[in-house]
Curated annotation (Swiss-Prot):
SUPFAM superfamilies xref list: Globin-like (SSF46458)
Domain (Globin) ranges: 2-142
GO molecular function term, any single one: haptoglobin binding
Subunit record text: Heterotetramer of two alpha chains and two beta chains.
Family that this chain belongs to: Belongs to the globin family.
GO CC list: blood microparticle; haptoglobin-hemoglobin complex; hemoglobin complex
Source organism: Xenopus borealis (Kenyan clawed frog)
GO biological processes: hydrogen peroxide catabolic process
Function: Involved in oxygen transport from the lung to the various peripheral tissues.
Keywords from the named record: Heme, Iron, Metal-binding, Oxygen transport, Transport
Pfam families the UniProt entry points to: Globin (PF00042)
Protein name per Swiss-Prot or TrEMBL: Hemoglobin subunit alpha-1
Tissue: Red blood cells.
Residues reported to bind heme b: 88
Gene: hba1
Length: 142
């Protein structure tokens, strides 16, 4: 999915705020995904799934750090996430259907925590960005 110059501007504007608290926002998005879609827990057999779990927060930070890295390479998201794509496709074999579930929960968390910044243009841009990231992470599933 092609990101317009306007999309890139909105992504660049909101990502530093998200990245500054990656453990909190990423953890909340994962917690919501696990709660609403329990089948997604299968990839984390040793996790404590309680709200504000240190394990969920730590993994949430990894998710947000990867998104932040991708946001720094909006013209080459595939290149910036290539190793992560390999990991998810070949080693972890994560169900590709899980990426859109997490993307949805990230949007929910961002909307809740940044209501003034999360205007329709930012919503659209972040949705397109997350869809692009999901597509990149599943591109090697063949």
């Amino acid at each position: 999915m092609l990101l317009s110059a306007d999309d890139k501007k909105h992504i660049k504007a909101i990502m530093p705020s998200i990245a500054a608290h990656g453990d909190k926002f990423g953890g909340e998005a994962l917690y919501r995904m696990f709660l609403v879609n329990p089948k997604t827990k299968t990839y984390f057999p040793t996790f404590d799934f309680h709200h504000n779990s240190k394990q969920i927060s730590a993994h949430g930070k990894k998710v947000v750090d990867a998104l932040n890295e991708a946001s720094n390479h909006l013209d080459n998201i595939a290149g910036s996430l290539s190793k992560l794509s390999d990991l998810h496709a070949y080693d972890l074999r994560v169900d590709p259907g899980n990426f859109p579930l997490l993307a949805h929960n990230i949007l929910v968390v961002v909307a809740m925590n940044f209501p003034k910044q999360f205007d329709p243009a930012t919503h659209k841009a972040l949705d397109k960005f997350l869809a692009t990231v999901s597509s990149v992470l599943t591109s090697k599933y063949r």
